[in-house]
Amino acid sequence: METIFAQSSAFGKAGVAVFRISGPKSLEVLQLLTGRKDFKPRLMYYQQIISPETNELIDNAMVVYFKLPNSFTGEDVVEIHTHGSKAISIMLINTLLNIDDIRLAEAGEFTKRAFLNNKFDLTAAEGIADLINAETIMQHRQAVRQANGGLEELYNNWRNQLLKIIALLEAYLDFPDEDIPDSILNDVNNTHKNIVNEISNYLNDNRRGELLNNGLKLAIIGPPNTGKSSLLNFLMQRNIAIVSNIAGTTRDIIEGHLDIGGYPIILQDTAGIRAESTDIIEREGIKRAINSAKTANIKIIMFDAEKLDLSINNDIIDLIDENTIVIINKIDLIEPSQIFPIEKKYKCLRVSVKNNIALSSILKNIENIAENIAGFTETPYITNQRHRHYLKQALSHLMAFNLDNDLVLATEDMRMTARCIGLITGVINVEEILNEIFKNFCIGK
């Protein structure tokens, strides 16, 4: 196995930069850079880092040696903690590149080696990637659970039950003359039925985990000049949308990313929806607004309190569902006692975006809907499409399983089911899958 290295911290100015070396020559490289031979594992040392070629001092650093298998990768590992200077990073990287039998690591190669050395399964490796990319508290919680074996335990439980079924069926095939109690086949059928139900229910999760990973789309829609762009600017705490009294100012979808209550929200301000527009570009914007609303996880429908009765049309009303927040804006311009017909049918929030009236209620409603859609629960959810793909394949093999037909075919269905789940956890190793997963890591991880 080659020895690899990379800067694990971000390149640039910082208090500390961390370099990681992994492989059989790690300790030898550390000894070469420091001129010191006696390094005890897991102890930090304050050492000068010197170029072996020029004898030039690169930096005074803290270094530590991890002896295999007690390291992240399961190999001999060295970490060098220097000052976070671009010049130091460049000098140390060039120095390491000039040492024989050591090369720059590929993206995700340290984590890939840890997986190959059985430090964790493939779902945990993906959890580490999600943890690195997590931007909100809820994404962090989901990633931590997965990185610490939450999904591995679930999938391995199913696979172990399947392996027991396979063992029983193979024994039945290998010793056909032996009397095998009917109770064993009944147990096989019952276990099969339970796994079918569990995987079916697990797949029927409305993609909660994937939505939490990728972000929930929130579309702000409504008639022109109701304050949609002003609301977007308020939520983003900066002006990313043009605000104007001229109808049709927003013609395309404007997008921003936000953390509301720990949930990743992708905000979309859309063109005002009105039936009478003759402008070709505006009509295309209206079409996109409606399509955006139809695919959104959360919708905010805004109306102008002064023009509410005139602005309601079926294109807008038809979009209202349980994940919709109906807002009546500009309430400072009407009498508080005024009640609109739409308020009798739907729960509406009365706000004034311009004067910052009741805007906190919008944030709370968004958070409540996001929690209902993708809230963190005790049961770990499917977090990416790869898992869903193989679970669907596993379920199709389970549905084909039938002990009343050919027992050989039934056994093969069980093998294929176990294989699909093994592909998720990495028990069954396919190089193409590994390359696809680990290429999404940053270099140094």
Curated annotation (Swiss-Prot):
Quote one Gene Ontology molecular function term: GTPase activity
| GO BP annotations, alphabetical order | tRNA methylation; tRNA wobble uridine modification
Which CDD domains does this one have? trmE, TrmE_N
SUPFAM superfamilies from the UniProt entry? P-loop containing nucleoside triphosphate hydrolases (SSF52540), TrmE connector domain (SSF116878)
Ranges of residues in domain TrmE-type G: 215-371
Keyword Nucleotide-binding included in the entry's annotation: yes
Mainly localized where?
cytoplasm
InterPro entries associated with the record: G_TrmE (IPR031168), GTP-bd (IPR006073), GTP-bd_TrmE_N (IPR018948), GTPase_MnmE (IPR004520), Guanylate_kin-like_dom (IPR008144), MnmE_dom2 (IPR027368), MnmE_helical (IPR025867), P-loop_NTPase (IPR027417)
Q: Which GO terms describe its cellular component?
A: cytoplasm
Query: Where does the UniProt annotation locate this protein?
Result: Cytoplasm
Annotated positions binding (6S)-5-formyl-5,6,7,8-tetrahydrofolate: R20, E79, K119, K445
So where does GTP get bound? Answer: 225-230, 244-250, 269-272
Protein purpose: Exhibits a very high intrinsic GTPase hydrolysis rate. Involved in the addition of a carboxymethylaminomethyl (cmnm) group at the wobble position (U34) of certain tRNAs, forming tRNA-cmnm(5)s(2)U34.
Q: What is this protein called?
A: tRNA modification GTPase MnmE
The organism encoding this protein is Rickettsia typhi (strain ATCC VR-144 / Wilmington)
- Gene name as annotated: mnmE
